[in-house]
Amino acid sequence: MAHIVTLNTPSREDWLTQLADVVTDPDELLRLLNIDAEEKLLAGRSAKKLFALRVPRSFIDRMEKGNPDDPLLRQVLTSQDEFVIAPGFSTDPLEEQHSVVPGLLHKYHNRALLLVKGGCAVNCRYCFRRHFPYAENQGNKRNWQTALEYVAAHPELDEMIFSGGDPLMAKDHELDWLLTQLEAIPHIKRLRIHSRLPIVIPARITEALVECFARSTLQILLVNHINHANEVDETFRQAMAKLRRVGVTLLNQSVLLRDVNDNAQTLANLSNALFDAGVMPYYLHVLDKVQGAAHFMVSDDEARQIMRELLTLVSGYLVPKLAREIGGEPSKTPLDLQLRQQ
């Protein structure tokens, strides 16, 4: 439960303006970054037909101009590698395409996951839901009401997870309505929101949203999705400070990505940047084996070695848990770092 605080924050219109100011063409993205369109980069153009390219200019501003290997760019730029059909990779790696009701997944005993909205501010090329049938699980009040009725009928649930897409694509008044409905269900104690929007467009943390969280009787956790320290800037730190003041618990989960953050020093820099922003590292996921993203894969042995090195670089509280999600399993599966074998 949080306390009401009045804050000066960006207007609702500001984040919506930034949300609409996006680049959807690979050639334009490369031009903005002063990157010569080499043959390899041009070959990836048609991958936008597999999964649309979408990058807000506010996120592009944090990319290094002239660097085709920029870690933020690599997360969003189409690639010819997306056409590779890799063994063991599928369109539904987590076996999520069977909702208990439209838009609601009950994969874990005490938690249910609501797909609040299908869209995202940015399309990340490694997204494990890039093939998800959002058309069959639309985020609207009718489906939300059906989902809430299911939640109310299942007293084993004590935590709701808002996901997507990105749940913060919902307008402030929609989120306020959802929180009010959840607060009326006695067995729901916590709300966990997984979102990339606060890092992509920090202005999403509006005064109305902060006050909505401040009023809530639920324990609210925000799990940011941030993969590299270069994503973190002053506007993000200010947004997180506003949420901390009203009692929101701030966490982060990352994905271990080839040529983005697959070394210990990069992850140490990320953990330090997160902590400076008041955010605790939570999980580091090995890649979900979604079709079209095999080029981001880091092997388990490499991941363990990176984590063993990370342990020597930062304090223990800055080391995220290395884990993978396996479809059908009742929880995430931690990866043993095999420290005793070293």
UniProtKB/Swiss-Prot annotation:
Tell me the ranges covered by the Radical SAM core domain, including all copies. Answer: 106-329
Keyword Magnesium in annotation: no
Residues annotated for [4Fe-4S] cluster binding in this entry = 120, 124, 127
Superkingdom as given in the UniProt entry: Bacteria
Catalytic activity annotation = L-lysine = D-beta-lysine
State the needed cofactors, names only.
Answer: [4Fe-4S] cluster; pyridoxal 5'-phosphate
Q: What is this protein called?
A: L-lysine 2,3-aminomutase
